[in-house]
Amino acid sequence: MDESKAVDNTVTQQAKLTACLIVKDEERFLPACLASLSGIADEIVIIDTGSSDATKEIASSKGTILYAYAWEDDFAKARNFAIEKATGTHILMIDADERLGKESKDKIDRFLREYPLSLGQVAIKSPYQQSDGLTYTASSKVTRIFPNLSTIRYQGRIHEQIISTDPSIQTVATGIILEHDGYALSDQAMRDKTKRNLKLLEAELEREPHNAYLHFQVGKTLVADRQQEEALEHYELALVSAQEQATYRPELLMATLYLLKDMKFQDKIWAWVRWGLERYNDYPDLYFFVAKALMEFQVDNLPMIQQCLELCISLGDRSEQYPCVDGTGTFLAQFNLGVFYEVQNQWEEAQNHYQSSLDQGFTPAKAALDRLQSKVLLMKKR
């Protein structure tokens, strides 16, 4: 697309949004993704890298513009190919296992209207289960919506990042939400994805052995492959070498801490917690982790558990500032304070916190309230 024409379109004409997808064997997820784009994207460009299932048929039946593409083990190349095929003034890059959140249309319209020459960050919401049986949702910020200019392209074979060569282009938060289902893959599909990613990342790391971000991503992939000791080496190397202002470093810290907790390396946990608090003393996820780790390791320090959870609540939602697990500064902290007071038989305090958690939409708090009520009734009968 001619850049001068794109700038003119972006600024003076009605915005046109092209959604771009890179797909292979996505018949399971693609229908929901395309449905979420209906009435929002003016054009949908799908780059198929060799599907053998019904992906291409689904794409064609939904009126998308479909291109075959020979996969070159390079996600940035594939995404840039999609951008070249887009005719819109703006690009929304979305994966097949993602869906636009229901409230995103107005936010997209506002971004296109008020920030036509900016890079737009969206929140990717990824649900996952923890060992306590509860479902948590990780929230991370990624640039996915941007003007269709030749100065804006992707770099990196894997975990590619959008780069603008124009220093005047700013990045803004949009409030747009993408709901991610990628962790719902079958075991075999997840193993295949992990193997592919690890191969690409290791090739990149050979070229850039001191790239802290690559070490972080290798560590994440090794965790998924259950290679914990090797993952920890990459995490710790990334932590000490990442630049102070690196936006991914808080997420890297939390990934390291949760891995150490799984490995039950308590001494290392508290050393990295101290390191983290020196840098991120307003990060609710960090205090939430400390409280959960103290409880899990049965450390006899009830005042510290209480203080950490209360600090989470006083800090509140910091998802605009940090990559967060939803609720660490709100409903999850309230719920865990409920647990804290319940095990000490302080039932009125427990009830108040469970109720507050439920009022904020955390449905497991309802079962906790019912359980607590049964306990109270049983004690009264005695």
Task: Please name every model-derived segment.
Residues 42, 56-81, 85:
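Conserved donor nucleotide-binding strand/loop of the catalytic core
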Residues 20-43:
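Short, well-formed alpha-helical segments that are part of the catalytic scaffolds
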